Amino acid sequence: MEKLVHKEIEKRRRQEMASLYASLRSLLPLEFIQGKRSTSDQVKGAVNYIDYLQRNIKDINSKRDDLVLLSGRSFRSSNEQEWNEISNHVVIRPCLVGIEIVLSILQTPFSSVLQVLREHGLYVLGYICSSVNDRLIHTLQAEVNDLALIDLADLKDTLTLMK
């Protein structure tokens, strides 16, 4: 009798685990479980997917914070004119090709920005400009041969203090 009870409990446990693993598989994108048969591979795929999502969340939060910093000070400040009179705003972060520079410059000619980048040994590969709250937001991707040789803090200070 005791063996039958134990056997039945074990059978239910296996069925429940199979159901849970099937549910896990249904939640994961195919590229994270493709070709993986064992449950340990599926769990590892789930862990990788969670890590992937966490990195994406950090990247998106960082971009949101940068955009709020560059364009949304008027949300935090009651005096919008104060925001418009503030100096240039610069955010520099690593990207696949080197670094990404997001900046909002007031009266600085854009050619001066390009000159500073050239002086720091950066080669612009991509550029996007958009208008947010009547300010231009410039986003540049620059190739960097050796990131260790570039003083990002100095570059940020130089771009921020440009007139």
Curated annotation (Swiss-Prot):
Gene3D superfamilies: Helix-loop-helix DNA-binding domain
UniProt GO MF annotations: DNA-binding transcription factor activity; DNA-binding transcription factor activity, RNA polymerase II-specific; protein dimerization activity; RNA polymerase II transcription regulatory region sequence-specific DNA binding
Keywords on record: DNA-binding, Nucleus, Transcription, Transcription regulation
InterPro entries cross-referenced by the UniProt entry: bHLH_dom, HLH_DNA-bd_sf, MASH1/Ascl1a-like
Domain bHLH: 1-53
Any one biological process term the GO annotation gives: regulation of DNA-templated transcription
SUPFAM superfamilies named in the record: HLH, helix-loop-helix DNA-binding domain
Alphabetized PROSITE patterns for the sequence: BHLH
Subcellular location: Nucleus
Signal sequence, renumbered to the chain: none
The protein's assembly and partners: Homodimer.
Name listed for the protein in its UniProt record: Transcription factor bHLH118
Gene source species: Arabidopsis thaliana (Mouse-ear cress)
